A protein has these predicted regions:
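Cytosolic Rossmann-like ligand/nucleotide-binding regulatory domains
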Residues: 453-509, 513
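Alpha-helical transmembrane segments and immediately membrane-proximal extracytoplasmic
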Residues: 1-437, 445, 452-453, 478-483, ...
Length: 517
């Protein structure tokens, strides 16, 4: 009797489970495992090559005759990466705009081609000391793994997008040991809404990917700076000033970065061979500053241990800014996440040391401003303050700075907004898809649009809104409820609209509706 009741109870329990969510969590774990392995191997190669680069350049200074061989090797790397870019243009740059374009149905990608070519191209570009980050390629590698899973499972377009999102989160999590930041990046930067299936799948993938990464690299945070004291409230006015400085410099970064393609266009080189320039210039950087090569995490750690002079900091800032622009503008496979954080750390150290001299800041708090400025600078450029705050928190491994991080990120964000700056990855995506011809593909897709506070759609009847052509409002999600809309359905703040359309029109439809909202 008891056994029978037990069986009934188990059946009732299983019936109450949301099988769709459980299924997607399982798929997220699968994606996270694959992405974690791929990205961890990618990261391991870059770190191991980066460890021997200073030794190589020290040897080249002693035996300059071998500079000829090293120059030839760097030229070969540039040519190989150029050939990969020519055969697969979607591996150019960080890869984040391409992933966002996939999710918006503005870019079509062959996952296997991108996966192996980005892997090799990224190692050759980032590993050889160029001022590029591993996080952008890691996000694209994670998304490619997810697309491969979706293809093998013969998933529909909507499911493929959910898995792509989870792969992107997993890629960032494995690159920086930051699973929560990986989730927030997808929610804040990519989707701009909190879809339950997206965040559940992405979080499962990010956690699993991070577990794989921690197994390989250990539990120590990527940017472990030791004990960081809590900043006293009497110094909080400096955070507002720092936020203003970061906002102005962040907007300057955006303007220069978006102008690079035009400037590189004046060179008599095919687009896929522009990487020859940074590959040759990095030799000079390596000879004179071998410890400053790469994305810059070693610089951040060094700044946390001792403060250089103001002149040295300004010189380092100039070098990092200029050569990171030269590196990224060439179109080589590499990201800007870590270079941005490095620039933010240098700005923070420069600002704090000035505050020590002019405003009486205690030197013990210089490390605080290094951490705070990293988040503020990224929040300004990427216009994703939550991601910036949590990313830096997870990378540093300290939870005591959420208030100063939040204040500085908010001020920097507002300043960039006043100066007319757009999120950098959205601006790069617009450049990427600009001028593409549109034609009906006949392939169905679903796009999601959140109804935000202050939207004109809030309180509007479905029939009273001027909907664009080539679309159908298929579903309205309100929390965990799914509502089939009709003309008399009232749209409310917090709803998510699911719109059915052709893949070619998806991007234009989202832009048109957002403009009317």
């Amino acid at each position: 009797m008891d056994e029978g009741n037990g069986g009934v109870n188990v059946k009732k329990f299983l019936d109450t489970l949301d099988k769709t969510k459980i299924k997607y969590i399982g798929k997220g774990i699968l994606v996270g495992t694959l992405a974690g392995i791929v990205v961890s191997v990618f990261r391991l190669w870059i770190e191991k090559i980066g460890e021997i680069l200073p030794v190589i350049y020290q040897y080249l200074k002693v035996q300059p005759i071998f500079l000829i061989l090293w120059t030839i090797l760097m030229l070969l790397c540039a040519i190989v990466v150029g050939a990969l870019i020519k055969s697969e243009p979607n591996i150019k740059g960080s890869g984040i705009p391409q992933v966002e374009g996939q999710l918006k149905d503005e870019i079509s990608v062959l996952w296997w081609s991108v996966l192996w070519k980005k892997f090799i191209g990224g190692i050759l570009s980032v590993g050889t000391g160029l001022f590029l980050g591993r996080e952008g390629p890691s996000i694209q590698l994670g998304a490619s793994c997810a697309q491969g899973v979706a293809t093998k499972m013969k998933a529909g377009k909507s499911e493929e997008k959910i898995l792509l999102s989870s792969g992107a989160a997993a890629g960032l999590a494995a690159a920086f040991n930051a699973p929560v930041a990986g989730l927030l990046f997808v929610v804040e930067e990519v989707h701009h809404n909190f879809s339950p299936l997206v965040w559940l799948t992405s979080f499962a993938a990010a956690l699993m990917s991070n577990f794989v990464s921690l197994t390989i690299f250990g539990l120590q945070p990527v940017l472990h700076l030791g004990d960081i004291p809590s900043l006293p409230l009497r110094h909080y006015w400096l955070l507002i000033l720092l936020g203003i400085v970061l906002g102005i410099l962040g907007r300057f970064y955006q303007v220069i970065l978006l102008a690079l393609e035009k400037w590189y266009g004046f060179l008599p080189l095919p687009a896929h061979l522009r990487g020859i320039i940074p590959f040759l210039l990095v030799i000079f950087v390596g000879l004179f500053f071998p410890n400053y090569l790469g994305g810059g995490n070693q610089i951040i750690i060094a700044l946390g241990q001792h403060s250089p002079t103001l002149i040295a900091l300004f010189g380092l800032l100039s070098l990092r800014f200029i050569f990171s622009m030269v590196s990224y503008g060439s179109g080589l496979p590499g990201g800007i996440f870590l270079p941005i954080l490095t620039l933010g750390a240098i700005i923070g150290s420069l600002f704090a040391n000035c505050a020590v001299i002019f405003f009486g800041l205690e030197p013990t708090f210089v490390k605080d401003f290094i951490v705070i400025a990293m988040a503020g600078y990224f929040a300004a450029i990427g216009k994703a303050p939550l991601t910036a705050i949590i990313l830096v928190t997870e990378m540093v491994g300290s939870l005591v700075h959420l208030m100063p991080l939040g204040l500085t990120a908010l001020v920097a964000y507002v300043v960039v907004d006043i100066l007319g700056g757009d999120p950098i990855y959205e601006a790069l995506l617009e450049r990427l898809v600009k001028g593409k011809k549109t034609h009906l593909t006949g392939q169905r897709t679903t796009v999601e649009i959140p109804v935000l506070a202050g939207s004109k759609l809030d309180g509007t009847l479905v029939r009273d809104f001027d909907w664009p052509n080539h679309m159908l409002l298929a579903l309205l999600r309100r929390g965990d409820r799914e509502i089939l809309p009709h003309g008399d359905t009232v749209i409310k703040m917090g709803d998510t609209l699911e719109i059915l359309t052709d893949t070619t029109h998806a991007g234009d439809i989202v832009r048109t509706i957002n403009e009317q909202m």
